[in-house]
Design a protein with these regions (language model features):
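N-terminal small-domain helix-loop-helix segment of the aminotransferase-like
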Residues: 1-59, 66, 334
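Helix C-cap/helix->beta junction micro-motif
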Residues: 93, 155-156, 183, 265
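PLP-dependent enzyme catalytic core of the Aspartate aminotransferase-like
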Residues: 291, 301-334
Length: 334
């Protein structure tokens, strides 16, 4: 799983334990405390985001679903490969999907497909799903190209969903949260799941500066959708700045170590900025490692990828070394 290898912060564990005593009460349906905390943290980063610009969801997936039910897009454009949750959401409203294929010859770099992507973003398109960084490639988009896409989509009347669920793992990444007031067609989605290692709690948020659009999305979210425990854990996690910085440094070191080792094995490695790595090998590595009770992600079912593409998560150093040892044994025994 692509969650933080450092595990859940101790402060969040404490908040969860404390919140259990309040589970005999209904959660705050407005998530006021959590929104206030997020807005305060955004202010520290100089993002012009207020509490009213924020919607909370039972994970990012619930927010993607609420977006498509609010907008009812007939056609979406999605760079491929990308997270399958966008496809799942579009299928719920019987929407058409057009894929802009990222090329391995270009390092799956989204900046290289900019012209192809813009050409697909015509008046017939209702919504564009972007991930920054991309999952499964781990690639970040350049700031200038994000701006260009946002400008073009605004001119064409196209909504943009910017999925930033892994952005906190990227030390040098700039969030599109800076631009939610400038672009009324922009929705930024982030999650607590990955960076704070709390996938079992289900907590994500959406930021949108367009009041009308935001209210329409809110009407497509269920009542009481964020539990007492999730709200308290989120409010505590949002303040854990030192933990995020420590995570970024740790992931950067371990990712470089893994990428170098995979390259030495002779695999084609997609250089990543996130906490996971995409690579290609002709070995049936998924099956070989499964026999050793190690599970990696077979990416052959991603749109735009074929048999032989795999993704691994950056984990604790001892786990990373164990994985590499097992891969080495697979190569020797092949």
């Amino acid at each position: 799983m692509n969650i933080n290898p450092l595990g859940m912060p101790d402060t969040v564990k404490g908040a969860i334990a404390k919140a259990i005593t309040h589970c005999d009460q209904y959660p705050d349906p407005t998530c006021a405390k959590l929104k206030q905390t997020l807005a305060q943290e955004f202010a520290v980063k100089r993002y012009d985001v207020s509490e009213r610009d924020i919607l909370l969801g039972n994970g990012a997936s619930e927010l993607f679903m609420a977006i498509v039910h609010a907008i009812r897009p007939r056609r979406a454009v999605i760079p491929a490969p990308s997270f399958s949750g966008y496809e799942y959401a579009m299928q719920a409203v019987d929407g058409e999907i057009a894929y802009c294929l990222l090329a391995e010859a270009e390092g799956f770099d989204p900046d290289f497909c900019q012209e192809r992507l813009v050409a697909m973003l015509t008046a017939e398109t209702d919504i564009l799903f972007l991930a920054n960084p991309n999952n499964p490639t781990g690639k970040l988009m350049s700031e200038v190209n994000v701006h260009h896409l946002l400008d073009h989509c605004r001119e064409q009347g196209i909504f943009v969903v910017m999925d930033e669920c892994f952005i906190d793992f990227c030390a040098d990444a700039e969030s599109a949260l800076r631009w939610v007031k400038k672009y009324e067609n922009l929705m930024v989605v982030q999650a607590f799941t990955k960076i704070y290692a709390i996938p079992g709690l289900r907590l994500g948020y959406l930021v949108c500066g367009n009041k009308s659009l935001r209210e329409k999305i809110a009407r497509n979210l269920p009542e009481w959708n964020v539990s007492v425990i999730a709200q308290e854990a989120g409010a505590t996690a949002a303040r854990a700045r030192a933990y995020v910085t420590r995570t970024q440094k740790y992931v950067q070191r371990q990712r470089a170590f893994l990428e170098a080792a995979l390259t030495d094995f002779g695999f084609r490695v997609c250089e990543s900025s996130a906490n996971f790595i995409l690579f290609y090998t002709e070995l049936p590595l998924y099956k070989m490692l499964l026999k050793k009770k190690i599970l990696i992600r077979d990416c052959s079912n991603y749109e735009g990828l074929t048999q032989g593409y795999y993704r691994i998560a950056v984990k604790r150093e001892e786990e990373n070394r164990q994985l590499l040892k097992m891969i080495g044994e697979c190569i020797e025994n092949n």
